[in-house]
Amino acid sequence: MSSLAILSWNIQFGLGVDGRVDLPRIAATCRALGDADVLCLQEVSIGFGELAPAAAGDQVAALAQLFPDHEPVFVPAVDRPGPGGRRRFGNLILSRAKVLDVVAHALPRPADPAVINMQRHALEATVAAGAGALRIVTTHLEFHSLAQRFAQTGRLASLEGEWTARGHAPSPEGKGPYGALPPVAGTVLCGDFNFPTDEASYAVLTGPAGGFVDAWPAIHGAAPHAPTCGVHDRHQWPQGAHARDFFFVSTALAPRLAGLAVDTRTDASDQQPLLLTVAVDGPASR
């Protein structure tokens, strides 16, 4: 049995605690953590120079050049006009494993006039994994609005229910876009969820109706989650070190979890990268 390594990181458009936007540093930090088959990066910018002048360029193209053996998958959550063309912001997947299918899911954004908020989505890429396939979903949930974040976790739980049901009762195979995919072993859901483990949104995903298992306790038992935020950047995160970035997996995948590591040393972003290893049947598919 081989394995698939998946990295998740909110790179904050490459902005480090030192105030520099440095995508080569992001790439080097990813490689230092491990040889990831799939990278799931949040807060990737095209044209949003107001975030930082160095974020005005095409970060998707730049990151794709830094990982030439990986296929880029980018569908923006935010897509706006700008003086130099479209401005886009969202989640990027870079996959060395063959990408079999891509779906972007717009997440709920109920009205919340009390706080600023933005459109969020979940980017789904089904990739070849051994003799079958694995569904990898990355997201970045709403930070300011608790109501929107709660609705978004509910939608993610609902999606997992749909995926599981389709796996148990597949449709007949057709031609062209109706063609079937290889059997999908389950879902890996990762990203910046913007909630702590004691928020109700966490229970929506990991409770009986959520369909997901938190990979950290599944691997590390009762050990506290390694902090993924506020480790180095106390200006943005005065509450200090805590976890808000997670890997969740389908219950069927829990026995296949082989490792989960967090790099708490890097300050190349305001948040920390995580690397999950999942066992897959047969040789790795690349």
Name each region found by the language model:
Residues 1-34, 38, 78-79, 83-286:
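Active-site regions of metal-assisted phosphoester/phosphodiester hydrolases
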Residues 16-20, 46-58:
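Short, flexible/disordered intra-domain loops and linkers
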Residues 58-66, 92-95:
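Short, electropositive alpha-helical surface patch
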Residues 67-70, 210-211:
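Short helix-capping segments at alpha-helix termini
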Residues 70-78:
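A short acidic/basic microdomain associated with nuclease active sites
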